[in-house]
Amino acid sequence: MVRCHVKSPTESPPGQQGSGQQGETEHPDQARELRPEDIPVYGRTHRGRYHYRHRSHTRRRPYRRRRRRACRHRRRRRGAAGPPCAPIPGTPQASRQGSGCRRMRRRRRRCGRQL
């Protein structure tokens, strides 16, 4: 635990109270109380963690900023990984081909766009 450093009477010139609080020299053994108003807000507050440019990386994946990619990009990458194969007729994959991502399908259905 870190305590605040209080100047001894020999370090400070006589007649000056360090922070302007009365009674500080009367009880030097008490640690000063920290209040949220006294803490300067500089990128980090008294609550929570500091998330600005927080790096997250593992041995496998070095640090890269997370960026949202389009579904089309992911589909293209996924399709390039394996050998191209034709979908089997009658399976759910065959009927779903070329219809976009699930989120877009759900959004279209909710809008009630019927012809």
From Swiss-Prot:
Gene name per UniProt: PRM2
Any one of the GO CC terms: nucleosome
Protein name: Protamine-2
Family: Belongs to the protamine P2 family.
UniProtKB keywords: Chromosome, Developmental protein, Differentiation, DNA condensation, DNA-binding, Nucleosome core, Nucleus, Phosphoprotein, Spermatogenesis
Alphabetized PANTHER family for the sequence: PROTAMINE-2
UniProt source species: Bos taurus
Subunit structure: Interacts with TDRP.
Post-translational events: Proteolytic processing into mature chains is required for histone eviction during spermatogenesis. Transition proteins (TNP1 and TNP2) are required for processing.
Any Gene Ontology biological process: spermatid development
Transmembrane segments: none
Known function: Protamines substitute for histones in the chromatin of sperm during the haploid phase of spermatogenesis. They compact sperm DNA into a highly condensed, stable and inactive complex.
